[in-house]
Every structure is written in C-alpha cells, then in structure tokens.
Amino acid sequence: MAQALAQPPLVVTTVVPDPPPPPPPPHPKPYALRYMADLLGRIGIMDTDKDGNISPQSPRSPRSPRNNILMGKYELGKLLGHGTFAKVYLAQNIKSGDKVAIKVIDKEKIMKSGLVAHIKREISILRRVRHPYIVHLFEVMATKSKIYFVMEYVGGGELFNTVAKGRLPEETARRYFQQLISSVSFCHGRGVYHRDLKPENLLLDNKGNLKVSDFGLSAVAEQLRQDGLCHTFCGTPAYIAPEVLTRKGYDAAKADVWSCGVILFVLMAGHIPFYDKNIMVMYKKIYKGEFRCPRWFSSDLVRLLTRLLDTNPDTRITIPEIMKNRWFKKGFKHVKFYIEDDKLCREDEDEEEEASSSGRSSTVSESDAEFDVKRMGIGSMPRPSSLNAFDIISFSSGFDLSGLFEEEGGEGTRFVSGAPVSKIISKLEEIAKIVSFTVRKKEWSLRLEGCREGAKGPLTIAAEIFELTPSLVVVEVKKKGGDREEYEEFCNKELRPELEKLIHEEVVVEEALYLPSDTE
C-alpha cells in the first residue's frame, strides 16, 4: 500500500482591492468661475477669454520697468481700485519721489457712453476747488486711448471703513464734520455742488484729516436752469434729500447740507437715520423726515441734526448758520491756506500764534528763500523776468490770450511804470499794511492775502513785475482767490488810487508794447 504523500497546507490569499479614488471636486458654478477668473486677472496672475476660461498670464507691461513709466514722469504701482470706466493706481513721481494716485480712464468707453462732457466738467470742477480738505488734482494727461488724472494720494482710506467698525467719539465726529462743512462751504462759494456726499466719498489722510473726493456727479452754477435749480436725479439713496426725490427742481446747495446731516448722524450713531430693507419704504421715511436719535446724543447735537434734516429746504439750516452753531463751533479753527506756484500751502493757527509770540510780524511773512527788499540793496537783487514776444503781444488789450491758459474767473489789471522796482514793492507792502493783509514775497512777485475768511476763501491777490525796457517795467495784478466783489472794492478804494502815482504818465500801454517790424 503506497504511503500517501504529505500535502502542504493550503494557503489562501485574500486580495483586498485598492480603495476607489476620491471623486473629483465639483466644477465651479459659472458665476463662481467668472468671479475667480476676474480676480486672478486683476491681480496679474491669469488671463481670461470672453468665455471665462483662464490661462497663465504672459508678462505684462506694469511688471516691465520700461513700460511701467507713464509719460516719463510717473512710475505706476499697484491697483488701488476700479470702476466701470476707470482704474486707479498708486504711482510715484519720478522726480520728487512723492506718491500720487492716477485715475486711468478708458476713452472709448466714455465716448460710447456719451460721458465726454461729464469728464470735461469734472476736470473743470477739480481746477476750481483747491482746498486742504479736498483731494487735489495735479494734472491731466492723455494718449489716444486713455485719459490720466494725476491726483493727491490719500493713504488713510475711506471714512466709511472707519465708521463700519463702530460709531465715533463725539470729538472725532465733530472734527470730521467741521472739516466737511469747511470744504463744502468753499465749494459752494466757487459755484460747485457735490450732490453725492457720503462716507464712501470722504477719505482720510495719514494725519487723520478729511478729504472730499469723487466730484463725478457734481454740478456747477453754469448748469442751473433759468429758475436757478438743478433738475437731475442723482446721488446715493440713503443720503438723498427729500426734495430731490420729488423729481422737481431743487437747490443743490441745500441738498448738500441734507447729505452733511446724514453723514453727521452716521458718524455719531454708526448707522444711517432712514434705514429700511425696502428702498421705497426708506424713501418714504426720508420724505417724511422720520428718524430717531440715540440716547447718547447730546441735546445740542439733536437740535443741530433736527435743523440739518429738516424736510423743508426753505427752513433747513444754511452753511453760515451751521458755522455759528454752538455744537459746531466747539474747538473749530478756520483753515488758512494759499496757492503758490500751483501748490496748495496750508497755515495752522497754532503755528501763527507761535510766530506772533516770538516777535515776528503778522503782517509780512518771509522765509530764507524769499527776498527782503528792505534788507537787500537793489544792486544785489536779480533782474526781473524779461518779457518775450508772446508775453508782449498777450499784454496788448487787443491780443489778450490769457483766457486760453488761466482759470476761469481770474480778474486782473496791468500798468507800465518807470519807478524803481524797490519803490513799487514798498508801495504794495504799504497798501497791504493799511488793510492788514499778509504779504508773501518771492523775487519779483508778491502775494497779498486778506485775513477775512469769505465764502470763497480769503481774498488773495498776486502782483508780478516784468522788465519791459531797461527803464520801464510792467506790473501785473491779478485776483487769485476770494470774492470778486471784495476784490473790486479793494482795487477801487485802496489799490488803484495808490498805484496811480507810479504809472508812467508819458507812456500808454499800447505804445510801450509797440513792436517794430523787420522792414522798418
């Protein structure tokens, strides 16, 4: 019997299958993909086509040092913001190193939308309103496809972002409101009405001062109809005055005051006074003036807000009345400023008080770079600028071309004198002293500034002296700021009677400006 062979034990191997791969992430919804593509495109990482497909972006000009320079003057930096027709970039002035904000406007878009006149009006308005609490327009440049607004860079962001964190202390809110009213008063005095005042259009600089921006919806006095009213429905719903909602004519200055009242309420309360999810219900509240002040509002503040948010524009408080209000006046300081060499210069009252206490004269302001005629001999002074042919032609009454280059509304006069330059300057200083004007001197130009703060700012007069011949000079006097009537009164009562003594009696202007031809 054959012996059975021993069999090895049976080994059973269990094969465990690999786990299934995880399902792919869900494809983004069309609107989400579109948002992501737009975001990546804006920050310079991806390109997008018309269908929203994204692809790695090729090197772009802003990253190229050569193409990052605008007009040879500014180096473009990061994108600060964008709208339908424009983008705003941080930039740096290559020469001075100063930061600026450059608003880049697409010409094709504004032409298709019929906004060319709108852009021209905004430029005109920004030239009119030169004030420490208003964002300053430095210059406007253009290419075939773009328009560039070179503006003051305000690094503190929107006031809206500050308020979004919570209501402000009363003293802080008061200071912002004072600065707002100061700037709005100046605008109204210059015939400019903002019509879209809101915290989003109020910026803060690095020193915590307010700057009014975005004059895109502004109106100027020349736009008003024969009834003197605006008829355009515009603005942001929560800040619109009730009379604007009626779609009838309204006084733009009074509508701005209403918006200032809403802003003050927002600063103090942390929310708008007429809020409702339903915009039509909100409009009804605005029209009826239905709002409630929080319990922490002082009685003086409540009285002021009641006047500001008066639904009747005829009885609503005015800017001059606001400036006399007890709550408003607390700690208020009139901002003093002047424009020199196209640069806005500000004077703080505290600095003036220190200067007065140190023995300096408050009538004549000087610096190391300025020329003091009384201390320097006339022989050591540089000669005044000589007039070129274009200057001489433009000085002639029949060929006055200054209107092509100067800001609208600049009144002026000129005369020829044979008196020594030192005598002319001394006479202008003497006139300024009589009426307590401040005098600023720089070479052969003087600036006389009144101390009274009018609706259009202090009266400012510039006088420049030009050499016509070795023995004759032309003295040109112009109003640079302030009220026209005040300027005419000053000229008729003070300036002309005194300067007539210096006019060269034997030479009339046209004869002095006579140019012989080459054939004579």
Swiss-Prot record:
The modification Phosphothreonine is found at residue 232. Residues 410-439 are annotated as: PPI. Its cofactor is Mn(2+). The active site is at residue 196. The modification Phosphoserine is found at residue 218. Its EC number is 2.7.11.1. Residues 214-243 are annotated as: Activation loop. PROSITE patterns: NAF (PS50816), PROTEIN_KINASE_ATP (PS00107), PROTEIN_KINASE_DOM (PS50011), PROTEIN_KINASE_ST (PS00108). The keyword ATP-binding applies. Residues 382-406 form the NAF domain. Keywords: ATP-binding, Kinase, Manganese, Nucleotide-binding, Phosphoprotein, Serine/threonine-protein kinase, Transferase. InterPro entries: Kinase-like_dom_sf, NAF/FISL_domain, NAF_dom, Prot_kinase_dom, Protein_kinase_ATP_BS, Ser/Thr_kinase_AS. Residues 55-66, 356-366 have a biased composition (Low complexity). One of its GO terms (biological process) is signal transduction. Residues 74-328 form the Protein kinase domain. It catalyses: L-seryl-[protein] + ATP = O-phospho-L-seryl-[protein] + ADP + H(+); L-threonyl-[protein] + ATP = O-phospho-L-threonyl-[protein] + ADP + H(+). SMART domains: S_TKc (SM00220). One of its GO terms (molecular function) is protein serine kinase activity. ATP binds at residues 80-88, 103. Residues 1-29, 48-67, 349-368 are annotated as: Disordered. Residues 17-29 have a biased composition (Pro residues). Interacts with CBL1 and CBL9. Belongs to the protein kinase superfamily. CAMK Ser/Thr protein kinase family. SNF1 subfamily. The activation loop within the kinase domain is the target of phosphorylation/activation by upstream protein kinases. The PPI motif mediates the interaction with the ABI (abscisic acid-insensitive) phosphatases. CIPK serine-threonine protein kinases interact with CBL proteins. Binding of a CBL protein to the regulatory NAF domain of CIPK protein lead to the activation of the kinase in a calcium-dependent manner. This is CBL-interacting serine/threonine-protein kinase 18. It comes from Arabidopsis thaliana (Mouse-ear cress).
